[in-house]
């Protein structure tokens, strides 16, 4: 078995990636989320495949086909809710994974980090298009509002929006193409995940101290396979509690009403995992400015390696920057809350203050804190 594992051209790739991979001896449970994201992706592809067998991407039958899946298909309700709530678990793991990278300075592995940002954009695009497919009220109006933002692009905006719609409004052509893209993107994401891992294995994993761990490595299997397996059990337990007891808690009741272009919902809002970006978008009165802020709210992650001023890699021994980091986390929670609120006083001003704080903490306060800590510790 050892000979096959180390000599077979295909199996040796798996061996070098998941079995004999040298890993730091001190990585904590915060390093579990990579494997959990892989599990989420597998769950989403499998459940999505079975949903696609019964779904029809036509405006007249899309809503009915989802109802048919839940009522008539064997365990269709389970597959549908696993897919819907699996997306939420995916984003929880994604945010924690990115947060871990920010906390421990993993963004200094620039290729891996940039690949991760591309993956984040791809997953967000996939989730957005998936939300349109059930063709409920929030599906239709969410698609209308978000795609319409592209009309803010000077000169080509309106033409671009109509090209994406396949007509003069969100309609049959839009739904069909969104289904096609929603189906193909997870496979593209899978390919990008392998590139992400390829870049990661060029440098090796970071660790909580932020120091070079070449002198103290242990094999990935069995130590981290068993540790990952515990994470898998916790994730699956959380997902199944959500699916079996609270399947609609993260959804929007409006999406149980079939799409009606003549009736606008009182509050149009995306799924909870986009609310922070949606709040930033709404905080700027100018349409183009809002769209740029929306894109920058994610793209700003690419600037983190340039904004790193500290002589230390992670925040483990940096109390001032730690404080800034946790204020940023609280700020993101406030933005998520604001994104789900109506556009009225006092939510408008809270959203604007939280949006300014979000960019200010990342661009100004965290780099300043890094320099102050260098000074205090005489690391200049």
UniProtKB/Swiss-Prot annotation:
Q: Where does heme b b562 bind?
A: 83, 182
| GO MF annotation terms | metal ion binding; ubiquinol-cytochrome-c reductase activity
The UniProt annotation places a ubiquinone binding at 201
- Keyword Signal on entry: no
Q: List residues binding heme b b566.
A: 97, 196
Compartments annotated for it: namely: Mitochondrion inner membrane
Q: Per UniProt, what is one Pfam family of this protein?
A: Cytochrom_B_C
Q: What else is known?
A: Heme 1 (or BL or b562) is low-potential and absorbs at about 562 nm, and heme 2 (or BH or b566) is high-potential and absorbs at about 566 nm.
Listed name of the protein = Cytochrome b
Q: How is the cofactor bound, as the UniProt entry phrases it?
A: Binds 2 heme b groups non-covalently.
Q: How does it sit in the membrane?
A: Multi-pass membrane protein
What does the record give as cofactor? heme b
What biological function has been recorded for the protein in this entry? Component of the ubiquinol-cytochrome c reductase complex (complex III or cytochrome b-c1 complex) that is part of the mitochondrial respiratory chain. The b-c1 complex mediates electron transfer from ubiquinol to cytochrome c. Contributes to the generation of a proton gradient across the mitochondrial membrane that is then used for ATP synthesis.
Entry keyword annotation includes Transcription regulation: no
> Which domain of life, per UniProt?
Eukaryota
Stored PANTHER family: CYTOCHROME B
Q: What does the similarity note say?
A: Belongs to the cytochrome b family.
Where mainly found?
Answer: mitochondrion
Assigned GO CC terms:
mitochondrial inner membrane; respiratory chain complex III
The alphabetized UniProt keywords are: Electron transport, Heme, Iron, Membrane, Metal-binding, Mitochondrion, Mitochondrion inner membrane, Respiratory chain, Transmembrane, Transmembrane helix, Transport, Ubiquinone
Assembly and interaction partners: The cytochrome bc1 complex contains 11 subunits: 3 respiratory subunits (MT-CYB, CYC1 and UQCRFS1), 2 core proteins (UQCRC1 and UQCRC2) and 6 low-molecular weight proteins (UQCRH/QCR6, UQCRB/QCR7, UQCRQ/QCR8, UQCR10/QCR9, UQCR11/QCR10 and a cleavage product of UQCRFS1). This cytochrome bc1 complex then forms a dimer.
């Amino acid at each position: 078995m050892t000979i096959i594992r180390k000599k077979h051209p295909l199996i040796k790739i798996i061996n070098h990636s998941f079995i004999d991979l040298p890993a730091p001896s001190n990585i904590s449970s915060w390093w579990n989320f990579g494997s959990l994201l892989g599990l989420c992706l597998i769950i989403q592809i499998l459940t999505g495949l079975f949903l696609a067998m019964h779904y029809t991407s036509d405006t007249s039958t899309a809503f009915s086909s989802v109802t048919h899946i839940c009522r008539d298909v064997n365990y269709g309700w389970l597959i549908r809710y696993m897919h819907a709530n699996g997306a939420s678990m995916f984003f929880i793991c994604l945010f924690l994974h990115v947060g871990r990278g920010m906390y421990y300075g993993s963004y200094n592995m620039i290729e891996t980090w940039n690949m991760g940002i591309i993956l984040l954009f791809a997953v967000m695009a996939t989730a957005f298009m998936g939300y349109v497919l059930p063709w409920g009220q929030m599906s239709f109006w969410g698609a209308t509002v978000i795609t319409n933002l592209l009309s803010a692009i000077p000169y080509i905006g309106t033409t671009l929006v109509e090209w994406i719609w396949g007509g003069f409004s969100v309609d049959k052509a839009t739904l069909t193409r969104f289904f096609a893209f929603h189906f193909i993107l997870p496979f593209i994401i899978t390919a990008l995940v392998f590139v992400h891992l390829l870049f990661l294995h060029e440098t090796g994993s970071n660790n909580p101290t932020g120091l070079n761990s070449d002198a103290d490595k242990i094999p990935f299997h069995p130590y981290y396979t068993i540790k990952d397996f515990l994470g898998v059990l916790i994730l699956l337990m959380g997902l199944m509690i959500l699916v079996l007891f609270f399947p609609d808690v993260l959804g929007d009741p409006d999406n149980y009403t079939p799409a009606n272009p003549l009736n606008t919902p009182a509050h149009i809002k995306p799924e909870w995992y986009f609310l922070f970006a949606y709040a930033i978008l709404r905080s700027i009165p100018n349409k183009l400015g809002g769209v740029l802020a929306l894109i920058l709210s994610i793209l700003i992650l690419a600037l983190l390696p340039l904004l790193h001023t500290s002589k230390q890699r992670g925040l483990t021994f940096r109390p001032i920057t730690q404080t800034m980091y946790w204020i940023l986390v609280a700020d993101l929670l406030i933005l998520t809350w604001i994104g789900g609120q109506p556009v009225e006083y006092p939510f408008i001003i809270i959203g604007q203050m939280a949006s300014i704080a979000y960019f200010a903490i990342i661009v100004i306060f965290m780099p300043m804190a890094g320099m102050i800590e260098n000074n205090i510790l005489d690391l200049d």
